[in-house]
Swiss-Prot record:
Gene label: amiF
Active-site residues, as the UniProt record annotates them: 60 (proton acceptor), 129 (proton donor), 162 (nucleophile)
Signal peptide limits: none
Record InterPro entries: Aliph_Amidase/BUP, C-N_Hydrolase, C-N_Hydrolase_sf, Formamidase
GO molecular function, one term: N-carbamoylputrescine amidase activity
Name of the protein this chain belongs to: Formamidase
Job of this protein: Is an aliphatic amidase with a restricted substrate specificity, as it only hydrolyzes formamide.
Annotated family: Belongs to the carbon-nitrogen hydrolase superfamily. Aliphatic amidase family.
PROSITE patterns: CN_HYDROLASE (PS50263)
Keywords of the record: Hydrolase
Length: 337
């Protein structure tokens, strides 16, 4: 059930629209301004398309296209005109919106950032992509963690970006922090189609969490994006799926965060987000509450290392034309100082 794409909205439903936006080419500030206008127009289309819609979601790269250009002239700032236009579009159309920007970083490479703006034009969620699609993408690794917010109609919402969703730990973190709906925006192209589909479903099922996922669409003359808007219910079943590859189509469905809450509390079989920390509770009271996973201990200790670590051949972006980096990240950078 998806309420006929949100046409029939139930008392506790949240209607989501996923914009399979036509892939643009953005090189200049003028291109950026033109694409900003296109996105603003599409926010209006979303409202005209479906009066019941609560949240409209735009894909990763919707503003900048699939260029890896880090030219500061076309990078965005939170107080810049592009974000201001998105805020006003949400106000004008009385709708929440999820947007993608490549964000200027004075201390390194730009961030690949995502914003959720409410219907009053306020930024409610600000996220920087944790896992850039290496070795292809040059973006700075995110440093803000994964925020979870209270979205439209009280739904708990998280946002991850593209390659993030290939790491099961990302979806688990969203759910662990309370997310009932996880948005995944992407710029993926056709070769990733199968991986895209099964990870969207797995991320939902393993965490009893709705996932709402969308890519860019169409061709820019070099790359062919696939659209593939998918709204997946918390049991892994697909509620809506854009399979035609039609650019600027908006894929819609009603989702039910209240049923997510009910499942997380009431399910026995396959309540995996709970059972991870309560292994074998039939045999031992409360289950085994330990951490048997070596990789988790090693990550916390800063000693994560694969058995084949020294054999990995691609460890920077030089194969894709980027210079080898010299800076280090986070605690390592502070220690070096």
């Amino acid at each position: 059930m998806n309420g006929l794409g949100g046409l029939n909205k139930s008392e506790h439903g949240v209607v989501i629209g996923l914009v399979q936006l036509q892939l643009p080419v953005v090189v200049t500030k003028e291109d950026l301004a033109k694409q900003t206008e296109k996105i603003v127009w599409m926010v209006g289309k979303a409202r005209r398309n479906l009066g019941t819609m609560d949240l409209v979601v735009f894909p990763e790269y919707s503003l900048h296209g699939l260029s890896m250009d880090t030219n500061p002239e076309i990078m965005c700032r939170l107080d810049g005109p592009e974000v201001a236009a998105f805020k006003q579009a949400c106000i004008d159309n009385k709708i929440w919106g999820c947007f993608s920007i490549m964000e200027y970083n004075p201390d390194g490479n730009p961030y690949n950032s995502g914003l959720i703006i409410d219907s009053n034009g306020e930024i409610k969620l600000y996220y920087r992509k944790l896992h850039p699609w290496i070795p292809v993408e040059p973006w700075e690794p995110g440093d803000l963690g994964i925020p979870v917010i209270e979205g439209p109609r009280g739904a708990k919402i998280a946002l991850i970006i593209c390659h993030d969703g290939m790491f099961p730990e990302m979806a688990r973190e969203c759910a662990y922090k309370g997310a009932e709906i996880m948005i995944r925006t992407a710029g993926y192209t056709a070769p990733i189609r199968d991986s895209w589909r099964f990870t969207n479903q797995a991320n939902a099922f393993q965490n009893l969490m709705v996932t709402a996922n969308v890519c860019m669409c169409g061709s820019d003359g070099s790359f062919d994006s696939m659209g593939e808007g998918m709204i997946v219910n918390f049991d892994g079943s697909i509620l809506a799926h854009g399979t035609t590859g039609r650019a600027d189509e908006i894929i819609t469905a009603e989702v039910r965060p209240d049923l997510v809450r009910e499942a997380r509390i009431g399910w026995g079989v396959e309540n995996n987000i709970y059972q991870l920390w309560h292994r074998g509770y039939v045999a031992v009271k409360g289950g085994a509450m330990d951490c048997p996973y070596t990789f988790m201990h090693d990550m916390v200790a800063g000693t994560y290392r694969l058995p084949w670590e020294d054999q990995v051949k691609i460890t920077d972006g030089t194969s894709c034309g980027f210079p080898a980096p010299t800076r280090v990240f986070g605690k390592m950078a502070k220690a070096a100082e």
